[in-house]
């Protein structure tokens, strides 16, 4: 003990005489007065001075916080570990954020959860590791009381938000895999952002109470880091500790286990049903064997997700609950510091499990950071395919997607047109079912489709068309030439019989015009992307609507209508069939000039 220059606050703790602030701080740290005194006596410390001690000491210096007399190598070891965790975590999460910001194919609503997880882990490493490392090198807390509170608040906020985000990811995958049809179009970008906002507010709600007297932010372990006070054996502190672990640790853990259990069971049940449908030939046996491999891989990844969550936060929970139960005398400074380091290390494996193992993230990182291609084991063949897919997303393509229902015009049996719109984004499956990494879907596009249908009950002379219906795709190439191709297998087109004396204007209204009964009208779906290419010529759409006569603009650049006029255009889009009664069917489609 120091005599003369310091006065005793409690047994074994001393403060400088000229620093009255130390007395107030040490007295406020009741968590470290009684319980830590007994805990430190359990540590077998080698003699470092002529007078050996194993209790907290404060040297005559400008630092008001007490220190723990432990070997220097203990501080340096923890400092080196936390520095490694911080650098690795910041690099890994930065790669995930960078790949998301550069790649258009990754900007899906479901991937917003992965990005939020990367942001919280990055901020956790950025705010905790440098300060923890600095104080470990000084072997004491050097940033004052306000610095301790701010440090502990950031650790609590980002740590809680990370755990809640893990739960949100598990719930999102649960609905997509177990209820695929019901989940189509449900998760939009706006809803995903709203969910993340709720997660941040929820985390903030559990991080602010120590500022208002419910528990407190105090130094912990080797007194080189800070956290909330879980050592004080008072009703207020114990209530906060118990509620915090129920609503922040135990409930998310139960939800994660529940979701991944039913995800595994759903995929296993589906594979068994498919196996019963198929025969017992050699090919089906190979497929069954491959499904079993995928199931086992999925089970291992789900197990890793749960185990890493438990390993990261269970030690911290165990220490806090031990103090909550009144057995804080058994806790040593090392037992308080090591769980904090393990919890912060979760920022390393989260981006690996949820993002970097995903094929599209690896390809995006390898594309934009070529020096990491060999480290990520990305072959050049896959990289070229990924580059081609990126180029294809920058073209205006007419397509029909089962998961995209936005902007669809549908005509009811009463003859009225109705606009039905769905979610403005897509929710898709992952590239590999067994990967269980983030959901990936193609970037959503603004799609407009017009379907002309006719209730067969109103038309007694209806005869189905023998030719297969199709849709036209309008593809813009780098040369600026538009070409028309047949639709994919997934395209769904509706061809109906147009009622006599009725046709559609470009506004969707029904107008009376003389049209032959047997005419079949088809209007293709047009996908309009917001991105333009510098190689494409400027396109100005014009519309030509005729209420009296109906004309068809074919694929020829110039064609005479019923009145002898000539319709010209650089490119014309039409699927209508000519009829012997009238000249041609009206072209209610844009002409690109």
UniProtKB/Swiss-Prot annotation:
It is found in: Cell membrane. The keyword Ligase does not apply. One of its GO terms (molecular function) is G protein-coupled photoreceptor activity. Residues 581-593 have a biased composition (Basic and acidic residues). It comes from the Eukaryota. Disulfide bonds join 148-226. Keywords: Cell membrane, Chromophore, Disulfide bond, G-protein coupled receptor, Membrane, Photoreceptor protein, Receptor, Retinal protein, Sensory transduction, Transducer, Transmembrane, Transmembrane helix. Photoreceptor implicated in non-image-forming responses to light. May be able to isomerize covalently bound all-trans retinal back to 11-cis retinal. Belongs to the G-protein coupled receptor 1 family. Opsin subfamily. This is Melanopsin-A. It comes from Danio rerio (Zebrafish).
């Amino acid at each position: 003990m120091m005599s003369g220059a310091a006065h005793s606050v409690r047994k074994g703790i001393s403060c400088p005489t000229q620093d009255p602030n130390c007395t107030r701080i040490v007295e406020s740290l009741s968590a470290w007065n009684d319980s830590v005194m007994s805990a430190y006596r359990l540590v077998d410390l080698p003699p470092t001075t002529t007078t050996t001690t194993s209790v907290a000491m404060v040297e005559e210096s400008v630092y008001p916080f007490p220190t723990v007399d432990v070997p220097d190598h203990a501080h340096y070891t923890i400092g080196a570990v936390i520095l490694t965790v911080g650098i690795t975590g910041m690099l890994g999460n930065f790669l995930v954020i960078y790949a998301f910001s550069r790649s258009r194919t990754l900007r899906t609503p479901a991937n917003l959860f992965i990005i939020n997880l990367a942001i919280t882990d990055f901020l956790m490493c950025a705010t905790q590791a440098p300060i923890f490392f600095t104080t470990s090198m000084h072997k004491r807390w050097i940033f004052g009381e306000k610095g301790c509170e701010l440090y502990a608040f950031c650790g609590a906020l980002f740590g809680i938000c990370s755990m809640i985000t893990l739960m949100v990811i598990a719930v999102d995958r649960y609905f997509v895999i177990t209820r695929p049809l019901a989940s189509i179009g449900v998760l939009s970008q706006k809803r995903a952002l709203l969910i993340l906002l709720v997660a941040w507010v929820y985390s903030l709600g559990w991080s602010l109470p120590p500022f208002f007297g419910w528990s407190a932010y105090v130094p912990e372990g080797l007194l080189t880091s800070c956290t909330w006070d879980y050592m004080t054996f008072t009703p207020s502190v114990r209530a906060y500790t118990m509620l915090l672990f129920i609503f922040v640790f135990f409930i998310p853990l139960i939800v994660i286990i529940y979701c991944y259990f039913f995800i595994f069971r759903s995929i296993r049940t589906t594979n068994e049903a498919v196996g019963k449908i198929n025969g017992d030939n050699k090919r089906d046996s190979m497929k069954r064997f491959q499904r079993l491999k995928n199931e086992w891989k999925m089970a291992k990844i789900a197990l890793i997700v749960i185990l890493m969550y438990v390993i990261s936060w269970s030690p911290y929970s165990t220490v806090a609950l031990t103090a909550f139960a009144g057995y804080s005398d058994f806790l040593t400074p090392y037992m308080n510091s090591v769980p904090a380091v393990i919890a912060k290390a979760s920022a390393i494996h989260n981006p690996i499990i949820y993002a970097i193992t995903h094929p599209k993230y690896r390809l995006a990182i390898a594309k934009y950071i070529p020096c990491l291609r060999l480290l990520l084991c990305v072959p050049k063949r896959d990289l070229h395919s990924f580059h081609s897919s990126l180029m294809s997303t920058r073209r205006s393509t007419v397509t029909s997607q089962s998961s995209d229902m936005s902007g669809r015009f549908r005509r009811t049996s009463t003859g009225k047109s109705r606009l039905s719109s769905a979610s403005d984004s897509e929710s898709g499956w992952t590239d590999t079912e067994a990967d269980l990494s983030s959901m990936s879907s193609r970037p959503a596009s603004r799609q407009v489709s017009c379907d002309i249908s006719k209730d067969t009950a109103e038309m007694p002379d209806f005869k189905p068309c023998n030719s297969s219906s199709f849709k036209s795709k309008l593809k813009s190439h780098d040369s600026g030439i538009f070409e028309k191709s047949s639709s994919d297998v997934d395209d769904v087109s509706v061809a109906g019989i147009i009622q006599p004396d009725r046709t559609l204007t470009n506004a969707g209204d029904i107008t009376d015009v003389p049209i032959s009964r047997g005419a079949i009208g088809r209007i293709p779906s047009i996908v309009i992307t917001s991105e333009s290419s510098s190689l494409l010529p400027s396109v100005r759409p014009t519309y030509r609507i005729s209420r009296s006569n109906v004309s068809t603009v074919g694929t020829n650049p110039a064609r005479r209508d019923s009145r002898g006029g000539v319709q010209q255009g650089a490119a014309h889009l039409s699927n209508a069939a000519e009829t012997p009664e009238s000249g041609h069917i009206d072209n209610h489609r844009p002409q690109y000039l």
